[in-house]
Amino acid sequence: MQIISDPHAMQAISENVRLQGKRLAVVMTMGALHEGHISLVTLARKSADTVIMTLFVNPTQFSAGEDLERYPRPFEQDVAHAEAAGVDYLFAPTSAEMYPAGHQTSVQCGALAERFEGAHRSGHFNGVATVVTKLLHITKPHTAIFGEKDAQQLAIIRQLVADLLIDVEIIGAPIVREADGLAKSSRNIYLSSNERKRATVLYGGLCHAKARLAEGEQNLKLIATEVEALITATEGCTIDYVAFVDEATFLPIEQADASKRYRLLLAVRLGSVRLIDNMVMGTKDSYKPC
C-alpha cells in the first residue's frame, strides 16, 4: 500500500491506473477506522481492480461547537487497518493541501440538504459536498462507496454527481452493527460504559417500528411517536428528530406503502454524544423482525 498526501501526485497515479485499463474505486473516510469502513473496502474490491481510501478530517463539514479538535486521529492504527483490508493507495492530505491559501470555491447544496441533519448542523452538507467533489476529481474513480448509515449524505452525493455530471457510480453499503445492534461509528468511543449500554435504544426504536409495520399499522406518525416515547424514556436521551422519509427526496411521509422504499431516521443526543441511525422500512422484506 502506498501513502500519498499530495493531491496532484494522487491525480497522476489515478490517471495512470485508468490508462492501464483498470477500474478504480474510492472509499472516503475521516479515519478512526472500524469494521464499517472495512466493509466499504470489501465492497469496493468487488467493483474495481484498484482501491483508494481517502483519510481526511474535513474541517469545512464541522459546524461551530462540534468536535473537530477532538475527533479521533489514530493515524498509524488507520494505516495498519487500511493495509490489512487490501487498500492499494491511502490518500491522506493535510488541510493545507486540500484548502491552500487563496481557496475560494465551494459547493452549495439545495433543498435536500436543508432538512434533518442539515437543519441541525449548519453548513455541514456544503462542506461534505465540497470535499467529496474535490476528492472525486483527485482520485478519478469509476465507483465510490459510501455507507448507508449517513443516508441523507448518500442521497446528497447521488444528487451532486447527477447535477454536476460527474462520471462516477455511487454505491451505497449496508450499515454494519455491533452484536447488540448499535451502528458502528467512530464517535462511539465518546460514549461512557453506561451510555454505551443505553445507546442500544436507537436500534430498539428501529426494530419497534419494523414490528409495528409487520403488525399492519399504517400510520407512520403514530409509529414515530411511539419510537420517540421509547427513546425519551431512556435516561440521558434527547431527540433531534425521528422521521419517516422518502429515500430519494428525504421528504417526510405519513402513511406506510410497502411498494416504496422509505427510511426511518433517528438523531439522538446521549449525554454529550450525538448518534444517528436509520433503517429501510419501505419494502416487504424490511418488515421482517430485527
Swiss-Prot record:
What are its GO biological-process terms? pantothenate biosynthetic process
From which organism does this entry originate? Answer: Chlorobium chlorochromatii (strain CaD3)
Give the domain of life.
Answer: Bacteria
**Physiological role:** Catalyzes the condensation of pantoate with beta-alanine in an ATP-dependent reaction via a pantoyl-adenylate intermediate.
Entry binding sites for (R)-pantoate: 61, 153
Q: Which gene encodes it?
A: panC
Keywords, ordered alphabetically: ATP-binding, Cytoplasm, Ligase, Nucleotide-binding, Pantothenate biosynthesis
InterPro entries, sorted: Pantoate_ligase (IPR003721), Pantoate_ligase_C (IPR042176), Rossmann-like_a/b/a_fold (IPR014729)
Q: Name one GO cellular component term.
A: cytosol
**UniProt binding sites for ATP:** 30-37, 147-150, 176, 184-187
What EC number(s) is this enzyme filed under?
6.3.2.1
- A GO molecular function held by the record: ATP binding
Pathway of this protein? Cofactor biosynthesis; (R)-pantothenate biosynthesis; (R)-pantothenate from (R)-pantoate and beta-alanine: step 1/1
Compartment list: Cytoplasm
The region annotated as signal peptide is: none
- Subunit structure, per the record? Homodimer.
Q: Output the lineage of the source organism.
A: Bacteria, Pseudomonadati, Chlorobiota, Chlorobiia, Chlorobiales
Catalysed reaction(s)?
(R)-pantoate + beta-alanine + ATP = (R)-pantothenate + AMP + diphosphate + H(+)
| Chain positions recorded as beta-alanine binding sites | 61
Q: Enumerate the active-site residues.
A: 37
- What does the similarity note say? Belongs to the pantothenate synthetase family.
Query: What else does UniProt say about it?
Result: The reaction proceeds by a bi uni uni bi ping pong mechanism.
- Protein name in the entry: Pantothenate synthetase
Which Pfam families has this protein been placed in?
Pantoate_ligase
Has the keyword Oxidoreductase been applied to this entry? no
Q: What class of enzyme is it?
A: ligase
